Amino acid sequence: MTSNLLSLYRFAEQQDIDVDWVSMTRATSLSVPLPDGRYAIAIDPWKMDSLTMETVCLAHELGHCETGSFYNQYAVCDIRKKHENRADKWAIRRLIPRDQYETALADGCTELSDLANRFGVTPEFMEKAVCLYTYGNLAIESYRPILG
């Protein structure tokens, strides 16, 4: 789990993406494009419950940067959701590659909590990954009764 987090910080550094720890009133984490074409990420460490939460937040924000999926406060809900989904999909593919996910299933690791522990992510994030790899989308609310 710690190795995932450290590799994400290294990746950000290699991509010249600033990652700063900042106390924020509302957000837990956020990413922004900078005028010079680079990106910056802010993470509020006081809102992180665990290293897995920090890992998921950083991967998600890197997903925004790597896919260029940004929006402003005036964007309509469907545009926001589209950009959030792109960031989540990037993060899922980075933290839980499909081949490793399939190997975990073949090994008998099928419970969400066990999968989350195996990949060092939060159960909520793992639920999104299962939904993406099973149904091809992130509409977890549509499949929650099935995913259990």
List the model feature ranges, each with a label:
Residues 1-148:
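Active-site hotspot residues in diverse enzymes, especially metal/ion-binding acidic/histidine motifs
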